[in-house]
Amino acid sequence: MKIDLKNYICSVPFNSLEIHNNVCFVCCPSWLPNKVELSEIPLKDVYNSEPIVDIRNSILDGSFKYCNKELCPYLSKLLNYGVASGPVSIKSNSNINSPIVENNTPDYLVMNFDRTCNYKCPSCRVDLIVENSKGIKRVEKTIEDIDNYFSQNVKTLYITGSGDPFVSVGFRNYLKNFNPKKYPNLKSIHLHTNASMWNKEMWDSMPNVHKYVRTCEISIDAGTQDTYENKTRLGGNWDNLLNNLKFISTLPIAVKASFVVQDTNYMEMETFYNLMYSIFGKKVNVFFGKITNWGTFSEGEFKLKQVWDTEHPEHHLFKKEFNKIWKNTNLFHNLYEFIDTTNKTLI
């Protein structure tokens, strides 16, 4: 399918900022890896800085040259399936025409500057990562900077894609002591979590964020206890997870349940989908995404993980499993290259 990207626009680099430890991005780093070093450009000046303006120009000129068109599910869907979705839309319907953002602040702010987590998932890290007192102070200082530079205009806060918001001392205290007066234009908070600590007691300890938390992503990557505890979520407790998911299902929050597809779990894609739908019903969207190498695998190890690769010895089995689910409702993915757009069958 021939798609001319000059006819399309992606709004993400024009309204989003993702803050990591010492660096910033304007999209998910695996989808658009260009970064801005905060040691070179201070946080208060970063949003209309030259590197970010350059990224926006690559969207405006239709090249999308910095984007990973395979890993981004929206570009993958457009290029392989001919469907514009999410932040990607037809350019003529958009009012985006300049690489400069008027108020020099993002609408959508991703807080990814604390990697603290109680799990050591092989797809993310090789050991437990927990900030010490110095690291906690750094996290708190960055939150203070956000309060000073961005809080007046930001509309959505995303906490967090780097660790877990309930495990992180800095993020947990931020949620517990959240002051809405500092964020007059805030519409929503999106929580990204493994849900291991998201129980009623924890939720009741942060009442000021309740009306803002309208969406969440829960990263699970397994459909059975064995895979969850021994392969994809090392340190996890399956029964605790299920109990917390049932609690979360009682909240007025839309849920994205995510599953990173790899050699150790692809046989459970259908089981995972059915489990999530049985708990959350129609308010869940289930995402199946290709595993990304965040530096935890050697080249050879990562090749074995990529079960969707046509040269992988189990690729035919992956296709068989994917065929069971890809037409399901409330499901999205970045595996569109395996779908024949003419007769809507797997290639």
Describe the predicted segments one by one:
Residues 1-134, 300-347:
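N-terminal pre-core extensions flanking Radical SAM catalytic domains
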Residues 105-116, 127-141, 153-169, 181-199, ...:
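Core AdoMet radical
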Residues 15, 70, 75-78, 82-83, ...:
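Preference for well-ordered, secondary-structure-rich cores of eukaryotic proteins
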Residues 47, 172-176, 229, 245-249, ...:
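Non-transmembrane alpha-helical segments in soluble domains
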Residues 44-45, 54-56, 121, 125, ...:
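A generic structured-segment signal
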Residues 21, 156-158, 188-190, 211-220, ...:
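Conserved C-terminal portion of the radical SAM core fold
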Residues 60, 145-152, 175-182, 205-209, ...:
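Leucine-rich repeat
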Residues 169-177, 200-207, 268-272:
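Distinct, well-ordered alpha-helical segments
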